[in-house]
C-alpha cells in the first residue's frame, strides 16, 4: 500500500506539472493586447508631417487600412497596388501594417529583403491555417489571416517580389539595461507610460519607438530601441553558435551573420520582440508549415530567457 501510495503521489505531481505547463500563458510583453477601454485619439484634422518629407497626412489617412502612408517614395521602388492600396473590401494594403518599404515594427514582421518564395510560403501558411500565433486575438494576426485569404496569387507574387527587392537596413538599437520605462499598451504595441516612472526589466524585452508620433504616422524611417536584460547579447551569441548532434548552429541555416540563406530568412537586425514571438510560437507548436520541421528541434528545450537572448543577439546584428 505504501508503494502504491507513493506511486500515486508521484503521478499526481507529474500531472500537476504537465497541467501547469499546458496552462503557461504567453508573456504579455511579447503579445500586447489592447485593454478593453482602449480608444484611439480622435482626428482633429491637423496635417501630420515627418522629417525630410513634403507629404502631409491626417490621422484618418494614416489609419486607413487601404492606404500605405508613403512619406519618402524615393526610398523604394514603385509600390504594386497590393502594397500601396490593397483592394476593397478585404485585401488591406500590405504597406499599411508593414510600412511603405517593409520595416514593420514590434507588432509585425520586417519584410525587407526576405526572399519572394519565403513571403509567398508564409501567406500560404496563414491562409491554410497552419501558421497561427500563441495569442490569436491580436489585430496584427487577424488582419494578416484575413488578407492572406483574400489575396490572389498575382497579388501575393507582386507584393512578395516588391518586398524582396528592398535592401534591408538597420532600424533597431539593442540596449542592455537593468531598468526600463514603465509601459502601457497602445494599438498592439508598447509605449512609455504617460505617467512616467521606471521599473526593473526582469525577464522581458521592452521595445519602444524612438519617436512615438512618427510611429503613429507609420513613417518607414522610424527607429526602435529594444531594451533587453544585461548579458543577453553575449548569451544569445553563444546559444546561436552552439551546435549539438541533432541541432545545427543558427548560422548553418540562416547564413553567415544571420543575414539569410536563399529562402531561409535573415534574422539580423529584425525586431527582437517579433523574433521572440516566432521562437515561442515554434516551441509551443502553433507556428507550423513546411519550414517548421527544421526549427522545432532547435527550440524545444529553450527557456524564455534563452529565447530573449537569441532574439536580442539577432536584433543587434547588421542586416
Model segments located where?
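Extended intrinsically disordered, low-complexity coil regions enriched in Ser, Thr, Gly, Ala
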Residues: 112-141, 268-280, 284-293
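Sec/Tat signal peptide C-region and signal peptidase I cleavage site
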Residues: 18-22
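Short cysteine/histidine-rich zinc-coordinating motifs and their immediately flanking basic loops
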Residues: 105-111, 261-268
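Cys/His-rich metal-chelating microdomains
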Residues: 100, 256
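Flexible coil segments in periplasmic/lumen-exposed cytochrome c-class electron-transfer proteins
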Residues: 23-92, 134-141, 145-249, 284-319
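Bacterial N-terminal signal peptides
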Residues: 9-17
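Short, cysteine/histidine-rich loop/knuckle motifs that typically chelate Zn2+
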Residues: 96, 252
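Bacterial N-terminal signal peptides that target proteins for export
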Residues: 1-10
Amino acid at each position: 500500500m505504501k508503494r502504491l501510495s507513493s506511486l500515486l503521489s508521484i503521478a499526481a505531481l507529474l500531472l500537476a506539472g504537465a497541467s501547469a505547463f499546458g496552462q503557461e500563458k504567453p508573456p504579455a510583453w511579447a503579445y500586447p493586447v489592447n485593454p478593453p477601454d482602449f480608444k484611439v485619439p480622435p482626428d482633429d484634422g491637423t496635417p501630420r508631417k515627418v522629417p525630410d518629407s513634403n507629404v502631409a497626412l491626417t490621422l484618418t489617412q494614416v489609419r486607413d487600412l487601404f492606404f500605405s502612408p508613403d512619406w519618402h517614395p524615393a526610398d523604394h521602388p514603385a509600390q504594386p497596388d497590393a502594397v500601396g492600396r490593397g483592394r476593397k473590401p478585404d485585401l488591406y494594403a500590405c504597406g499599411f501594417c508593414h510600412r511603405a518599404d517593409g520595416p514593420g515594427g514590434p507588432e509585425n514582421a520586417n519584410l525587407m529583403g526576405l526572399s519572394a518564395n519565403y513571403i509567398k510560403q508564409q501567406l500560404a501558411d496563414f491562409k491554410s491555417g497552419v501558421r497561427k500565433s500563441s495569442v490569436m486575438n491580436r489585430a496584427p494576426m487577424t488582419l494578416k489571416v484575413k488578407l492572406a485569404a483574400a489575396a490572389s496569387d498575382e497579388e501575393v507574387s507582386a507584393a512578395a517580389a516588391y518586398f524582396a527587392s528592398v535592401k534591408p537596413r538597420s532600424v533597431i538599437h539593442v540596449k542592455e539595461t537593468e531598468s526600463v520605462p514603465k509601459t502601457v499598451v497602445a494599438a498592439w504595441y508598447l509605449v512609455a507610460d504617460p505617467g512616467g516612472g521606471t521599473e526593473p526589466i526582469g525577464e522581458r524585452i521592452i521595445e519602444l519607438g524612438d519617436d512615438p508620433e512618427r510611429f503613429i504616422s507609420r513613417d518607414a524611417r522610424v527607429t526602435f530601441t529594444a531594451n533587453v536584460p544585461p548579458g543577453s547579447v553575449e548569451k544569445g551569441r553563444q546559444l546561436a553558435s552552439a551546435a549539438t548532434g541533432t541541432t545545427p548552429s543558427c548560422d548553418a541555416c540562416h547564413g553567415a551573420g544571420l543575414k539569410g540563406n536563399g529562402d531561409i530568412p535573415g534574422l539580423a537586425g529584425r525586431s527582437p520582440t517579433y523574433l521572440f514571438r516566432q521562437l515561442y510560437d515554434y516551441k509551443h507548436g502553433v507556428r507550423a508549415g513546411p519550414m517548421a520541421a527544421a526549427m522545432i528541434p532547435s527550440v524545444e528545450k529553450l527557456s524564455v530567457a534563452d529565447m530573449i537572448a537569441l532574439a536580442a543577439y539577432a536584433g543587434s546584428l547588421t542586416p
